[in-house]
Regions:
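Surface-exposed repetitive/solenoidal architectures
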Residues: 1-335
Length: 335
């Protein structure tokens, strides 16, 4: 009802949102989320509205939601309502329950996004643009126009539990991110079972395959993963997968404060890197080139993992080796 929340859709494609005065207190006995991606979107009575010209509108007779869509995939984001609209479309197919017109989900995953103002999505329930279980890949562009994007993921009673891909973009391939300041804080509870799902965390991209261009990006990143299984955490990118295309970081600065406090862990691994958590083993030719040009990295990395698989690096925590060797080319790097 008007004082609580709506659940619209079906398993795997549901939208859950609250209107105002909503909160959730997680019990100490709960160790896993029932949903494996997303969170509860928190609308309000000011800038995140349930209305035809707001984020979305609700039809009580059919129990359906219409998201305020975009005419095409050239997107300008001027406030957090615009961000929410774009994120909802990236995460939901248009169907009988959740509808929108204009740019499709596929269009949005290849969008050209531009910021026209600073945007803070903290306390909205949004965990980034995309689903954080890594089903889809962003292939478009994001131009910050010197604006700042702030996000906080996993507050005390809104922790992200067992969600695998955590970042502004869950997965990227061929994406270009430029002229952006990003401030992000991740409090993520990863998988606690050996052999379970790895947890990927990166302020820009949790997991990248293929090319990636990051230019003129300033990132202030705090991340505190706590799962006992594998954690790949990077100031900008959590994991770079096997690829044959260049991944470049230019004219950028990262302050990465990364902490792993689970001192009881002796198996599996952690990779905490100032820019990249891990570059995966290369199985194809030509081997990828990871290029750093005019990059400054600062902050503090603390890893209390007590096993032999603890990896820490100022730029990259680990570069995997298999059939070929990835080339890491640093130029004008300060750590």
């Amino acid at each position: 009802n008007k004082n609580r929340c709506q659940i619209v859709g079906n398993r795997g494609n549901a939208l859950i949102y609250s209107l105002s005065g909503w909160s959730f207190t997680r019990t100490s006995s709960k160790v896993i989320d029932d949903m494996d991606w997303g969170g509860v979107l928190r609308l309000n009575n000011s800038d995140l509205l349930e209305s035809a010209d707001g984020v979305l509108s609700f039809d009580g007779s059919g129990h359906t939601v219409t998201i305020n869509g975009f005419p095409n995939n050239n997107i300008t984001i001027s406030n957090r309502a615009d961000f929410a609209r774009a994120a909802l479309i990236m995460q939901h197919d248009s169907n009988v329950f959740v509808k929108y017109s204009g740019a499709s989900r596929a269009d949005m995953l290849a969008a050209n996004i531009s910021l026209s103002a600073d945007v803070d999505i903290s306390d909205t329930g949004l965990t980034g643009f995309m689903r954080d279980n890594g089903e889809d890949t962003f292939t478009g562009t994001l131009t910050g126009n010197s604006h700042k994007l702030t996000m906080t993921v996993g507050t005390e009673n809104d922790k992200i539990v067992f969600h695998t891909h955590n970042g502004l973009f869950a997965k990227t391939s061929g994406a270009k991110i430029s002229d952006l300041t990003i401030v992000s804080n991740f409090n993520i509870v990863g998988d606690n079972v050996s052999g379970g799902d790895a947890c990927y965390i990166g302020s820009v991209s949790a997991y990248n395959s293929g090319a990636l261009t990051i230019d003129k990006v300033t990132a202030d990143v705090t991340a505190s993963p706590s799962g006992a299984y594998t954690n790949f955490v990077g100031g900008l990118v959590g994991y770079v997968a096997d690829a044959t295309s260049e991944v470049s970081f230019t004219n950028s600065a990262v302050t990465a404060n990364l902490t792993y406090n689970n001192s009881t862990t002796k198996v599996d691994c952690t990779c905490l890197g100032g820019v990249i958590g891990m570059v995966g083993a290369v199985t194809s030719k030509p081997a990828p080139v990871i290029k750093f040009d005019n990059v400054t990295v600062g902050g503090k990395i603390t890893d209390k993992h007590t096993g032999s698989n603890s990896r820490v690096g100022g730029l990259i925590a680990e570069v995997g080796a298999k059939d070929n060797s990835a080339s890491v080319v640093p130029n004008k790097v300060s750590i």
